[in-house]
Amino acid sequence: MEKKKYNISVEATLEVIGGKWKCVILCHLTHGKKRTSELKRLMPNITQKMLTQQLRELEADGVINRIVYNQVPPKVEYELSEYGRSLEGILDMLCAWGANHINRVYGDTFSVLEESVLNDKLKQES
């Protein structure tokens, strides 16, 4: 593997978790294992193709584990790997920053956020 060159280390971070969907996927996986269909339901605006691509990239980077159960019909779940769990603090801070940003721009965080487990957690903390 050829070594890459980065100007600053955050470039390496964004190479792994950057983009529109990866942090959202990771946030959902902080709440436990999820099947692809569960993730799709939690993120209705992502296409199936994009979800599959993002999951493959996160798995290739060692951030998530793909668990294949030997059964019929086939069952596959995704979970944060031990390495991926090291991102939980960062993901929590990103969620908190986003809530503050929404509140600053719109005045009320919860009038803008959709109903979800992640947002219920945020409501309990405020």
Swiss-Prot record:
Keywords: DNA-binding, Transcription, Transcription regulation
Protein biosynthesis keyword on record: no
Molecular function terms, GO-annotated: DNA binding
Membrane-spanning intervals of the chain: none
InterPro entries on file: HTH_HxlR (IPR002577), WH-like_DNA-bd_sf (IPR036388), WH_DNA-bd_sf (IPR036390)
Domain HTH hxlR-type: 8-106
Pfam families: HxlR
Keyword Disulfide bond carried by entry: no
Domain of life: Bacteria
Name this protein carries in UniProt: Uncharacterized HTH-type transcriptional regulator YtcD
Gene encoding the protein: ytcD
